[in-house]
Amino acid sequence: MKVSLFATCLIDLFYTNAGKATVELLERLGCEIDFPEAQTCCGQPAYNSGYVKEAKEAMKHMIRTFEHADYVVTPSGSCATMLKEYPRVFQGDREWESKAKALADKTYELTQFIVDVLKMEDVGAKLQGRATYHTSCHMTRLLGVKEAPFKLLKNVKGLELVPLPNAYQCCGFGGTFSVKMGTISEQMVDEKIEHIEEVNADYLIGADCGCLMNIGGRLKRQGKPIKVMHIAEVLNSR
Protein backbone atom coordinates (compact mmCIF):
# COMPACT_ATOMS: atom_id res chain seq x y z
CA MET A 1 0.00 0.00 0.00
CA LYS A 2 1.47 3.35 -1.06
CA VAL A 3 1.11 6.21 1.38
CA SER A 4 2.01 9.86 0.79
CA LEU A 5 3.21 11.52 3.98
CA PHE A 6 2.13 15.06 4.81
CA ALA A 7 4.71 15.95 7.44
CA THR A 8 3.29 19.35 8.61
CA CYS A 9 5.22 22.48 9.55
CA LEU A 10 5.70 21.72 13.25
CA ILE A 11 7.10 18.26 12.59
CA ASP A 12 9.41 19.63 9.91
CA LEU A 13 10.71 22.40 12.17
CA PHE A 14 10.44 21.13 15.74
CA TYR A 15 9.37 17.48 15.97
CA THR A 16 11.44 15.66 13.37
CA ASN A 17 11.65 12.57 15.59
CA ALA A 18 7.87 12.22 15.39
CA GLY A 19 8.12 12.41 11.60
CA LYS A 20 10.81 9.73 11.51
CA ALA A 21 8.77 7.56 13.86
CA THR A 22 5.75 7.91 11.57
CA VAL A 23 7.73 6.72 8.55
CA GLU A 24 9.35 3.81 10.41
CA LEU A 25 6.01 2.74 11.90
CA LEU A 26 4.12 2.79 8.61
CA GLU A 27 6.92 0.99 6.79
CA ARG A 28 6.94 -1.73 9.42
CA LEU A 29 3.18 -2.09 8.95
CA GLY A 30 3.73 -2.78 5.26
CA CYS A 31 3.29 0.65 3.69
CA GLU A 32 5.45 2.16 0.97
CA ILE A 33 6.12 5.78 1.91
CA ASP A 34 6.20 8.62 -0.59
CA PHE A 35 7.26 12.08 0.52
CA PRO A 36 6.32 14.79 -1.98
CA GLU A 37 9.04 17.39 -1.45
CA ALA A 38 6.90 20.18 -2.89
CA GLN A 39 4.53 20.05 0.10
CA THR A 40 4.18 23.19 2.20
CA CYS A 41 1.94 24.52 4.96
CA CYS A 42 -1.72 23.48 4.64
CA GLY A 43 -2.74 27.12 5.00
CA GLN A 44 -4.44 26.84 8.36
CA PRO A 45 -2.63 29.67 10.23
CA ALA A 46 -3.31 32.13 7.42
CA TYR A 47 -6.92 31.00 7.01
CA ASN A 48 -7.68 31.19 10.74
CA SER A 49 -6.13 34.67 10.85
CA GLY A 50 -8.43 35.94 8.10
CA TYR A 51 -5.99 35.82 5.19
CA VAL A 52 -8.33 33.73 3.06
CA LYS A 53 -6.92 34.72 -0.33
CA GLU A 54 -3.36 33.86 0.69
CA ALA A 55 -4.49 30.65 2.39
CA LYS A 56 -6.27 29.51 -0.77
CA GLU A 57 -3.03 29.77 -2.72
CA ALA A 58 -1.34 27.45 -0.22
CA MET A 59 -4.31 25.09 -0.40
CA LYS A 60 -4.22 24.96 -4.19
CA HIS A 61 -0.53 24.14 -4.04
CA MET A 62 -1.22 21.29 -1.60
CA ILE A 63 -4.01 19.94 -3.81
CA ARG A 64 -1.68 19.88 -6.80
CA THR A 65 1.13 18.33 -4.76
CA PHE A 66 -0.96 15.38 -3.54
CA GLU A 67 -3.15 15.04 -6.62
CA HIS A 68 -1.83 11.60 -7.57
CA ALA A 69 -1.55 10.15 -4.04
CA ASP A 70 -3.47 7.01 -3.12
CA TYR A 71 -3.60 7.91 0.58
CA VAL A 72 -2.42 11.04 2.36
CA VAL A 73 -1.46 10.38 5.98
CA THR A 74 -0.42 13.02 8.49
CA PRO A 75 0.65 12.71 12.15
CA SER A 76 -1.55 15.67 13.03
CA GLY A 77 -5.26 15.77 13.76
CA SER A 78 -5.29 19.53 13.29
CA CYS A 79 -3.69 19.54 9.84
CA ALA A 80 -5.77 16.56 8.72
CA THR A 81 -8.83 18.56 9.75
CA MET A 82 -7.69 21.49 7.62
CA LEU A 83 -7.28 19.32 4.54
CA LYS A 84 -10.75 17.92 5.20
CA GLU A 85 -12.06 21.50 5.26
CA TYR A 86 -10.77 22.32 1.77
CA PRO A 87 -14.06 21.41 -0.02
CA ARG A 88 -15.96 23.87 2.18
CA VAL A 89 -13.39 26.60 1.55
CA PHE A 90 -13.68 26.09 -2.22
CA GLN A 91 -17.43 25.53 -2.24
CA GLY A 92 -18.94 26.96 -5.43
CA ASP A 93 -15.60 27.07 -7.23
CA ARG A 94 -16.12 24.84 -10.27
CA GLU A 95 -12.43 24.24 -10.85
CA TRP A 96 -11.23 23.60 -7.30
CA GLU A 97 -14.13 22.22 -5.25
CA SER A 98 -14.00 18.73 -6.78
CA LYS A 99 -10.20 18.66 -6.56
CA ALA A 100 -10.40 19.69 -2.91
CA LYS A 101 -12.91 16.93 -2.20
CA ALA A 102 -10.68 14.34 -3.86
CA LEU A 103 -7.83 15.29 -1.52
CA ALA A 104 -10.08 15.42 1.54
CA ASP A 105 -11.52 11.98 0.85
CA LYS A 106 -8.09 10.31 0.84
CA THR A 107 -6.63 12.17 3.83
CA TYR A 108 -6.21 10.48 7.20
CA GLU A 109 -4.70 11.28 10.57
CA LEU A 110 -2.08 8.66 11.49
CA THR A 111 -3.98 6.67 14.15
CA GLN A 112 -7.17 6.90 12.12
CA PHE A 113 -5.36 5.38 9.14
CA ILE A 114 -3.83 2.54 11.16
CA VAL A 115 -7.12 1.55 12.80
CA ASP A 116 -9.65 2.27 10.04
CA VAL A 117 -7.66 1.50 6.88
CA LEU A 118 -4.94 -0.93 7.94
CA LYS A 119 -7.38 -2.52 10.43
CA MET A 120 -4.73 -2.84 13.14
CA GLU A 121 -4.89 -2.09 16.85
CA ASP A 122 -1.71 -3.79 18.09
CA VAL A 123 1.43 -2.58 16.30
CA GLY A 124 3.85 -4.39 18.58
CA ALA A 125 4.94 -1.32 20.55
CA LYS A 126 6.61 -1.55 23.97
CA LEU A 127 7.07 1.27 26.50
CA GLN A 128 7.41 0.95 30.26
CA GLY A 129 5.70 3.54 32.41
CA ARG A 130 2.52 5.33 33.38
CA ALA A 131 1.00 7.62 30.77
CA THR A 132 -1.98 9.81 30.11
CA TYR A 133 -3.28 11.05 26.76
CA HIS A 134 -4.14 14.63 25.82
CA THR A 135 -7.21 14.76 23.61
CA SER A 136 -6.71 17.62 21.14
CA CYS A 137 -9.63 19.82 20.12
CA HIS A 138 -9.38 19.72 16.32
CA MET A 139 -8.79 15.97 16.20
CA THR A 140 -11.84 15.11 18.28
CA ARG A 141 -14.37 17.89 17.80
CA LEU A 142 -13.77 18.60 14.11
CA LEU A 143 -12.09 15.52 12.64
CA GLY A 144 -14.13 13.18 14.84
CA VAL A 145 -11.22 10.87 15.71
CA LYS A 146 -11.70 9.89 19.36
CA GLU A 147 -11.21 6.16 19.87
CA ALA A 148 -8.38 5.26 17.48
CA PRO A 149 -5.51 6.57 19.67
CA PHE A 150 -6.82 4.69 22.71
CA LYS A 151 -7.30 1.45 20.78
CA LEU A 152 -3.63 1.59 19.81
CA LEU A 153 -2.25 2.78 23.15
CA LYS A 154 -4.03 0.12 25.19
CA ASN A 155 -2.03 -2.51 23.28
CA VAL A 156 1.38 -0.97 24.00
CA LYS A 157 3.20 -3.53 26.16
CA GLY A 158 4.30 -2.22 29.55
CA LEU A 159 2.33 1.03 29.28
CA GLU A 160 -0.20 1.84 31.98
CA LEU A 161 -2.65 4.28 30.41
CA VAL A 162 -4.65 6.36 32.89
CA PRO A 163 -7.54 8.73 32.09
CA LEU A 164 -6.77 12.44 32.11
CA PRO A 165 -9.23 14.51 34.18
CA ASN A 166 -11.19 17.00 32.04
CA ALA A 167 -9.63 15.35 29.00
CA TYR A 168 -11.64 17.37 26.48
CA GLN A 169 -10.55 20.70 27.94
CA CYS A 170 -8.36 22.75 25.57
CA CYS A 171 -4.67 23.07 26.48
CA GLY A 172 -4.69 26.73 25.50
CA PHE A 173 -2.67 26.48 22.29
CA GLY A 174 -5.30 27.00 19.59
CA GLY A 175 -2.77 28.07 16.96
CA THR A 176 -2.62 31.86 16.87
CA PHE A 177 -4.85 32.01 19.98
CA SER A 178 -1.82 31.32 22.17
CA VAL A 179 -0.09 34.35 20.64
CA LYS A 180 -3.02 36.76 20.60
CA MET A 181 -4.40 35.75 24.00
CA GLY A 182 -1.22 34.79 25.82
CA THR A 183 -2.41 35.40 29.38
CA ILE A 184 -5.52 33.27 28.96
CA SER A 185 -3.55 30.60 27.12
CA GLU A 186 -1.07 30.41 29.99
CA GLN A 187 -3.84 29.94 32.54
CA MET A 188 -5.37 27.18 30.42
CA VAL A 189 -2.14 25.23 30.02
CA ASP A 190 -1.40 25.55 33.74
CA GLU A 191 -4.76 23.97 34.47
CA LYS A 192 -4.01 21.19 31.99
CA ILE A 193 -0.70 20.50 33.74
CA GLU A 194 -2.47 20.30 37.11
CA HIS A 195 -4.66 17.52 35.71
CA ILE A 196 -1.64 15.70 34.27
CA GLU A 197 0.09 15.82 37.65
CA GLU A 198 -3.04 14.51 39.38
CA VAL A 199 -2.59 11.11 37.73
CA ASN A 200 1.18 10.88 38.43
CA ALA A 201 2.01 10.28 34.78
CA ASP A 202 5.53 9.60 33.56
CA TYR A 203 4.47 10.45 30.01
CA LEU A 204 2.05 12.88 28.42
CA ILE A 205 1.09 11.55 24.99
CA GLY A 206 -0.65 13.46 22.21
CA ALA A 207 -1.31 13.43 18.48
CA ASP A 208 -0.94 17.14 17.70
CA CYS A 209 2.44 18.85 17.89
CA GLY A 210 0.93 22.25 18.63
CA CYS A 211 -0.57 20.94 21.86
CA LEU A 212 2.60 19.04 22.72
CA MET A 213 4.74 22.12 22.14
CA ASN A 214 2.46 24.21 24.35
CA ILE A 215 2.19 21.69 27.19
CA GLY A 216 5.79 20.52 26.90
CA GLY A 217 7.14 24.05 26.89
CA ARG A 218 5.21 24.92 30.02
CA LEU A 219 6.31 21.72 31.77
CA LYS A 220 9.94 22.52 30.96
CA ARG A 221 9.68 26.09 32.25
CA GLN A 222 8.19 24.77 35.48
CA GLY A 223 10.91 22.14 35.84
CA LYS A 224 8.48 19.22 35.73
CA PRO A 225 9.95 15.76 34.94
CA ILE A 226 7.01 14.54 32.83
CA LYS A 227 8.13 13.46 29.35
CA VAL A 228 6.04 14.60 26.39
CA MET A 229 5.77 12.19 23.45
CA HIS A 230 3.97 12.22 20.13
CA ILE A 231 1.85 9.10 19.72
CA ALA A 232 3.90 8.10 16.67
CA GLU A 233 6.99 7.88 18.89
CA VAL A 234 5.12 5.72 21.39
CA LEU A 235 3.77 3.37 18.74
CA ASN A 236 7.25 3.08 17.24
CA SER A 237 8.87 2.26 20.60
CA ARG A 238 10.52 -1.14 20.95
UniProtKB/Swiss-Prot annotation:
One of its GO terms (molecular function) is oxidoreductase activity. One of its GO terms (cellular component) is cytosol. GO terms for biological process: lactate metabolic process. Disulfide bonds: none annotated. Belongs to the LutA/YkgE family. Is involved in L-lactate degradation and allows cells to grow with lactate as the sole carbon source. This is Lactate utilization protein A. It comes from Geobacillus sp. (strain WCH70). The gene is lutA.
